[in-house]
Amino acid sequence: MSNYWVEREAKHIEEMLKRHVNYEQEIHRRYLQLWKTIEAEIQQFYVAYAGKEKISIDEAKRRVSKHDVQIFAEKAKRYVQTRDFSKEANEQLRLYNLTMKVNRLELLKSKIGLYLTDNTNQLQTYFTAILTEEAVAEFVRQAGILGESVLSEETYRLFAKAIIEGSFHNTTFSQRLWANQDVLKASIDRLLTVGLVAGKHPDILARELRKLVVIDSLRGKETADYVARRLMISESARIQSEVQKQSYEKYG
């Protein structure tokens, strides 16, 4: 391989790594915003039902008022109307609508679940857009390397869609993304219940919940933030590899 091609490939790898850094920063920003929303909801919960720094589990398990239910239902309706929820997101929301009327604690869990669903739905859209652009660009790049004519962008987008929606080890990227949310939701629900039983101060509970959602270092492998970042990078690498493979099979 000539120096030209070696240098060209090295530059491509360098640019790809820079993009990966940008992707991780954007995902982190989204989870940080999600956390701030969750924290505010927890603080509001304590203010509304405690009037002091502690709330008993008995108080938390009292039935919610019709007014509280109506407020949540209206908020959920606005999310559906303005966010273009996916099939997965609508299914999650249906479950929250079923459980929110049980008691105040379940209403809090449903509110947080709504924010999680919105975040994951937006991440799915973000992932799909980024991966599509990467796949199209790589198809064009491979056509240039192999000396073939560049096809239309529409054609490449169809190729990209098939790759992105394809499974890897019998699971698609979107399934992995929603599974990450399921793990996070279950962990938050469990911590909320245990925290209220123990009578934890809301600030302590908030700090413990933050460790599940977001962390300021990539060392925190248990956070949903970290898992989503790793998923994005691994999917980006998979897309690049699959486009190259298909290009070589077609033109090589």
Q: In which residue ranges do the predicted regions lie?
A:
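Acidic, glycine-rich two-metal-ion catalytic cores of nucleic acid-processing enzymes
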Residues: A206, D216-G252
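N-terminal leader/targeting and assembly helices and adjacent pre-domain segments
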Residues: M1-L218
